[in-house]
Amino acid sequence: MSLHLSNVILHQLSKNDQEELIVNYRAESLENDTASENLVAELHRVFNSKAGKGFGSFKSDSEFQQSLHEFRAGEQSFYDFSQKSALRLKDELSKYPFADEGTLVLAEYQSLATDYLFIGLLPSNQSLKVTEGLDISATDYLDISKMDIVARLDLSTYDTDKESNRYLTYIKGRVGRKVADFFLDFLQAEVGLDAKQQNQVLMQAVEDFVSDSKLEKEEAISYKKQVADYCNEQLKAGDEVQVRELSGELPASTDGTSFFDYTSEQGYELEDSFPADRATMRKLTKFVGAGGGLNVSFDSLLLGERIFYDPETDTLTIKGTPPNLRDQLTRNKS
């Protein structure tokens, strides 16, 4: 990938004998060599592939934002900025039960004509290696795929549109760890774009458009599949859903109204673009549900053909089961 690295540095967060989190500062920034570029390129790639991201923007009194401004204005060096950030990260992280040790990475770089600032605490893991003497020894490595205490600032958007509610991106982390709360506090930022909510609004707009257009069942299913296919392709490419672009790929209603015009006229509060959510978009073409030991998923076109639902008795009837399921049921019965 095309990546231009401006600055990158590592600091270490570890616990002392009193189990207190401390910072071991690196003496200077890393050289902008091939190894450093490969590290940042991998961080960028893995971050893009992570699901469950949150978006936000700085509060007006954010000390992190002020420190960033001083660095970018040349009033302090990248090294000084990284030290202040590491100390602030340590102080904030110490308030949480998941005060992890790890390697703190700060990187300023450009990818695909967009400037970024990456901040992440990378966990380490152990593996084995074979020495020149063919002995086995333990080695530590950065477990980049497991990183979840991480945020990225889109500097290009931040410079051109400070009113944006999404130039900060962070990984929400596992349930119960409150990583999202931590990063918002650390950066002194507030929640901005809700990507999942945007996907839900899009799905509702599609459902309403199909209903108002009075499409036949097959046409409605085809229309929803086009939307789902577009969103999945955007996900695979690492791109966002562009509402106007999506509308251009969809047929207009019988009176000639495009999907984009429909969402505008009906007052759906959709951003021009937003990240696709696979789980939400999946519901356009499938019925999905789980609970009480039951997990059900089937293509929406099967409803009324092989699968029937009676709301009065809350009964789902399936005609023709998958061969592997039928085999299990038959063997269990005997």
Swiss-Prot record:
Pfam families: NA37 (PF04245). It is found in: Cytoplasm, Nucleoid. GO terms for molecular function: double-stranded DNA binding; single-stranded RNA binding. It comes from Vibrio atlanticus (strain LGP32) (Vibrio splendidus (strain Mel32)). Its main location: cytoplasm. Belongs to the YejK family. This is Nucleoid-associated protein VS_0951. GO terms for cellular component: bacterial nucleoid; cytoplasm. Keywords: Cytoplasm.
